[in-house]
């Protein structure tokens, strides 16, 4: 998924008045968390600015960007949530992967994005590629994503042949 496609999905969620999905997608994409880690985005985490993630027997801290905290804070007030998970069903249960996947797929036509590209995990990939393109620090990215191996993180940062070709053309090492 490209940044432009992500932006169109956000616009579609907003136009359909699906505030929960609009914020959920931004939460995943601006923090790099896994869908299964959304339950750790709590009212308390938003107040602190840090989510404590316990996953796969490991703990890590995820920092919530200031603008995200503001948006989530408004949403929490509107939803009258006092504590616990921010993203819940109408019954108050944490959202699961299938709810999120289904909601995202419903945006595809409006957003003009292929439904083959729209998966919650692709938001995590977009975060990773964007972070890496700015920072070029795969070790720090591995820490942020909660990977124990940098080799796992490299999968997220691999670029397409088109990008490689463009970079090679710019090297300027040929004299004609």
Annotate each language-model stretch with its function.
Residues 31, 35-36, 40-74:
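Conserved tyrosine-mediated DNA breakage-rejoining catalytic core shared by Y-recombinases
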Residues 1-7, 57-67, 81-83:
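DNA breakage-rejoining catalytic core of tyrosine-based enzymes
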Residues 172-176:
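C-terminal secondary-structure termini that scaffold catalytic or DNA-interacting sites
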Residues 6, 20-22, 97, 101, ...:
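Short, leucine-enriched amphipathic alpha-helices that occur as contiguous helical runs
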Residues 56, 145, 150-170:
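Catalytic-site neighborhood detector that most strongly recognizes the C-terminal catalytic loop/helix
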Residues 66-114:
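Active-site/catalytic core of tyrosine-dependent DNA strand-transfer enzymes
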Residues 3-31, 35:
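Basic, Lys/Arg- and aromatic-enriched nucleic-acid-binding interface segment
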Residues 26, 30, 124-148, 155:
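C-terminal catalytic core of tyrosine-transesterase DNA break-rejoin enzymes
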């Amino acid at each position: 998924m490209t940044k432009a496609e992500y932006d169109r999905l956000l616009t579609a969620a907003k136009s359909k008045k699906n505030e929960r999905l609009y914020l959920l997608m931004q939460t995943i994409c601006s923090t790099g968390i896994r869908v299964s880690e959304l339950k750790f985005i709590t009212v308390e985490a938003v107040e602190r600015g840090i989510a404590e993630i316990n996953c796969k027997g490991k703990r890590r801290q995820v920092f919530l960007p200031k603008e995200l905290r503001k948006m989530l804070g408004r949403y929490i007030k509107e939803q009258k949530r006092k504590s616990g998970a921010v993203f819940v069903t109408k019954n108050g249960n944490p959202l699961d992967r299938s709810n999120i996947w289904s909601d995202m797929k419903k945006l595809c036509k409006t957003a003009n994005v292929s439904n083959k590209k729209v998966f919650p995990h692709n938001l995590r990939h977009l975060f990773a590629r964007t972070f890496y393109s700015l920072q070029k620090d795969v070790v720090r990215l591995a820490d942020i994503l909660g990977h124990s191996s940098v080799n796992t993180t490299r999968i997220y940062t691999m670029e397409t042949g088109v990008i490689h070709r463009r970079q090679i053309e710019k090297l300027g090492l040929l004299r004609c």
